[in-house]
From Swiss-Prot:
GO biological process: translation
Subunit organization: Part of the 30S ribosomal subunit. Contacts proteins S8 and S17. May interact with IF1 in the 30S initiation complex.
Short name of any one Pfam family annotated for the protein: Ribosom_S12_S23
Residue(s) carrying 3-methylthioaspartic acid: 89
PROSITE patterns from the UniProt entry: RIBOSOMAL_S12
MF terms in GO: rRNA binding; structural constituent of ribosome; tRNA binding
Stated role: With S4 and S5 plays an important role in translational accuracy. Interacts with and stabilizes bases of the 16S rRNA that are involved in tRNA selection in the A site and with the mRNA backbone. Located at the interface of the 30S and 50S subunits, it traverses the body of the 30S subunit contacting proteins on the other side and probably holding the rRNA structure together. The combined cluster of proteins S8, S12 and S17 appears to hold together the shoulder and platform of the 30S subunit.
Keyword flag Membrane: no
Keywords carried by this UniProt record: Methylation, Ribonucleoprotein, Ribosomal protein, RNA-binding, rRNA-binding, tRNA-binding
Native species: Arthrobacter sp. (strain FB24)
GO annotations of cellular component type: small ribosomal subunit
Record's protein name: Small ribosomal subunit protein uS12
CDD domains (alphabetical): Ribosomal_S12
Taxonomic superkingdom: Bacteria
Amino acid sequence: MPTINQLVRKGRTPKVKKTKAPALNGSPMRRGVCTRVYTTTPKKPNSALRKVARVRLNGGVEVTAYIPGVGHNLQEHSIVLVRGGRVKDLPGVRYKIVRGALDTQGVKNRKQARSRYGAKMEKK
């Protein structure tokens, strides 16, 4: 417990909140260029080939971003929009690529949660 004199001299410092997506620099989303598109395997109890991409963001920072949904059209030099959001079973993947924005196409034949995957309403 500090004395009043100590509080007058130093004051209380507010706690600094650490950001979960530092490469975005406080922006909700950032544009970038794919430098490598590949698959990785998840952590222990799970088994799959998860689609990820190395993306060089506008600020020059390179991050690993997850490509959500079934199938994608991304390759090297594709321009993508990256948002925050980690993938729990892929260590080091703290960003996701926005489907249906810039060079990324939306998921085909998607019926539910379409807006998350950039899928248009199906014509009757």
